[in-house]
Amino acid sequence: MDKPNNIIICVGRQLGSGGQIIARKLAEEFGCKLYDREILNLAAKESGFSEKIFEQNDEHKGFFRALLSGHGRSFAINNFYQNEFSEENLFQFQADAISKAASEGPCVFVGRCADYVLRDVEGVVSVFITADMGERISRVMERKQCDEETARHIIENGESQRATYYNYYTGKKWGNAASYDLCVNSSRLGIDGATALIAEFIRKSSPTSQTCPTSPTRPTSSQQS
């Protein structure tokens, strides 16, 4: 089947919704590269900072406040003044890495405000994946090998961080339908059904239809959603 040319898909997701799995399947469907935590590695290479710094600040606003209140106070202060190191700078390095990756060909991004960073790029489709709370809790319990209460806490804490991060940098509201081109509840259709629906939406909304150059998807280390 013909596929949209130069497609860029940005996938936002609730924790435990299966969004990362759907993103991988979309990358396979359209022959695109998949960028999840790989963006942190690219940002680290471009900036010269350690990838660990980007990991600790990943979709988490307030990283420096935590450092300054703990044992990392001296480290944080020294790096801030000596390297003009701040959360906003980290976000910009990451945004630059996203823009560079998007310029190199068709790809799928998971989270990290990619939909906002690429808002002026032609062919970008933004999708948000949600799911029923019970299913999300079950998925997190299985992945983390924890009880229901712990899984619920992981979801609530993780989503609070994601929402704060997204809202701050984009000026939009995380998870609000108005912030995306398409919102899908994976509990209604299942992972494969949700993937098929999104793929069909992308094909129908694309102004051109042409086979994408096939690129192997990159393995992801994140299994959080």
At which residue positions do the language-model features occur?
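Glycine-rich phosphate-binding P-loop
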Residues: 11-24
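Small-molecule kinase domains that catalyze NTP-dependent phosphoryl transfer to phosphate-bearing small molecules
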Residues: 61-73, 147-192
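NTP-dependent small-molecule kinase module
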Residues: 95-99, 168-224
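Pre-Walker A (Motif I) flank of P-loop NTPase domains
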Residues: 4-13, 105
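Short beta-strand-centered segment that lines the nucleotide-binding/catalytic pocket of NTP-utilizing
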Residues: 33-44
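Conserved phosphate-donor/acceptor-positioning beta-strand/loop module used by diverse small-molecule
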Residues: 120-142, 148-157
